[in-house]
Amino acid sequence: MKKVAIVSCYFKKNYGSLLQAYATQKILDKLNIENETINIDENIDFKKGKKKFYKSQILNFPFIKSKIGMIKLKLDRKVNKKLNKNLEIREKKFEEFRNKFRLTKPFTTYEEIAQQCEKYSDVLVGSDQLWLPVNVVSDYYTLNWVPNKVSYATSFGISSIPKKYYDKYRKFLSRIDFISVREKNACELVTDISGKDAELVCDPTLLLNKKEWLEIQEEKPIVKG
């Protein structure tokens, strides 16, 4: 049987994204399904797509407002040396945790990934908030560039989709062979936009038991205090 390729947010330095990406890979391991996660650390197409979206939001006040916390944190890090040091320690630990992933070689374009698809039986996207408008515009988590595709517990991250993005959402949702999501509202969004049904499933982090999570838990806190 061919491998399954996983498309996840394994590179984000936050607990939710990394743990969900890890759990998705671990669950496939438990099912004896050979798998690996697509490496887009150096992907030009992905970066261009995100830049394009952010440029389009320059005059969108609600969007700018939602990023104020991120901007404030960057400024705080410049003036608060202790905060910056603690965050650097945390980020280093995130990088170390990434070593638990089986990553492919880095792919610089979507075309490069598509050319490798014959190696995989399916490409699985999930979970996390991968179907936010910014990600749909960047066209990576849509899986538009591969033939055999499924989603597991993927989230839209928002309760409604702006009408101007409906065509983009309809295009990629209608081409996914099997769709599962982690929120009831997301099931409704899939049906409303594409006319397709979506299965409601639990987040992959809930599929691992306590013992399995304790196996990767640090004995001591990363940062004191």
Region roles according to the model:
Residues 1-2, 223:
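Glycine-rich phosphate/diphosphate-binding loops that line cofactor/substrate pockets in enzymes
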Residues 103-120, 129, 153-155, 159-225:
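A nucleotide-sugar donor-handling region in carbohydrate enzymes
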Residues 4-15, 19-171:
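Aromatic- and Gly/Pro-rich donor/ligand-binding loops
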